[in-house]
Amino acid sequence: MSEYCDTEQLAYNLSAFKPGDEIEITLKMHGTSQRTGYLPMLKGWKVKNKFFQGIVNKYASSSNLSTFARKCVDIVMRDATPIYDWSYVSGTRRTVLENYDGGYYGSNEFREQHSKTFEGKLWKGETVYYEVVGFTHTGAPIMAEGNNEKLGKDFVKQYGKTTVFSYGCDPEGESFKHEYSDCWDGMNVREFKPQSDIYVYRMTMTNEDGNVVEYSPDFMRYRCEQMGVKCVPVFAKATIDGEGGHIYAPDNELYGFVHETNNAGDTVKLVAEKYYDGPDPIGKTHIREGVVVRIVNRPKFTAFKHKNFDFKVLSNIAIEQAIETGAIGKMSDDEISEL
């Protein structure tokens, strides 16, 4: 299964944008990355000579052979044919999950339910990349909380004293809302909310030779609609004109957007900053992390993140708290990179 592609900072990669590029701006979500694929997995080898088949079955994958024995096995393996079987595989950014025990969260049980969402739905060779947001199965926030008081009174007035990146999820998996009617003084109504949720941002197709083809964002959304899963919200789609200073997007407010200089990267950054700040459109009770700008017309996944100032402040606070409590020493590279 192909690894997660690191999303670099937009501000340091403005030169990546060229006139004529098609771009798409989506919401950057603060969660933990996960991927699930329905992929050809090597199950064994087949050789014509039945006598050698037993040797291949026993020693082909062994790492404890002597140099002479390894050479003998390698000679037999020259005419061996690989046997593949299609299997569902899940992982984090760079780790394939053999099981859902342990890990930074104590258990990856909350990941398992989302992996199973795709069973029976992915086509052979497809891999889906998604963000898991909300809370773990124990009710703990997937991502660290933020102390809003360090951002000033106005920020606290709007978002409260603490930021919890809930994205509409609930620690218990349900919540109660108080409803009134003419016949009743009021009643508590149980409303189901997920403890955690997923949002897809990338899909690929991998063949048996290991060649990977990137799905376009539109086709990714088509497949997600078929599977009944959500995608990251889209803010804008646009094309950079031949001079680099105009953004053309007839279906939204960016039509004819002009930057003072004819530089594609600077123009894209200015457009991205129209969307990267403010309340999160899903969570609404907390700020958004920022945006991701993807160059759609590239054969490989090419995207850059742009985070807003308030989120960066909250992230630094979370890092400081993790250092003070010693929690950062238990974090994997995946968790640290998400802070």
Where are the regions a protein language model picked out?
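Core nucleotide-handling region used for phosphoryl-transfer chemistry
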Residues: 1-339
